[in-house]
Amino acid sequence: MVKKTNDRSNMRKIILALILSLMSSTTFADGHSGKIDLKGFFAADAKFLFNEKGVGTFIYDGMGGLMAMSGTFGDSTSQYCVGAGSIPGKGVEMGHCTIKFINDDTAMIYFEIPLDNTMGGKFECLGGTGRYEGITCSGETGYQQIKSAVEGKIHATNYYKGTYTLKQ
């Protein structure tokens, strides 16, 4: 009788350990947080305003596509952005982008990019719709301008690298 009790006790411990193991695995692999690693292309209409000394400002309104460089977050998304900055390149360029995911849900981000280091900016999520409602995110962003084939347009490659958490 003592052996049966020990066997039952051991079996209970094993089952309890399995249950706890499954619960903790689910907690860490819940899909509610992860890394952002996106790269893409951006094209926009731009307007420039200068004074007689060459000091001025620029504004733009455009869109582009993004793809995930690692993982799947944000793969095959599009972005629509508006922004502004100063010329000559002192201060920051700032703006907002709406990221549209493949399932039609969106996330809105705010960004600031130093004009003397266009690959060294920061971004953060302001909110989202659908699955991305309540999203929080932050990280690094930047761009490398490409010589435009058309006057009044800007073209660039850009990136977002950071982390996100979805509302549970």
Residues covered by each model-derived region:
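Positively charged n-region of N-terminal signal peptides that target proteins for export
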Residues: V2-I14
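Short, linear, compositionally biased motifs with a strong N-terminal bias
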Residues: L20-S21
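Beta-strand-enriched cores of mature, soluble protein domains
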Residues: D30-Q168
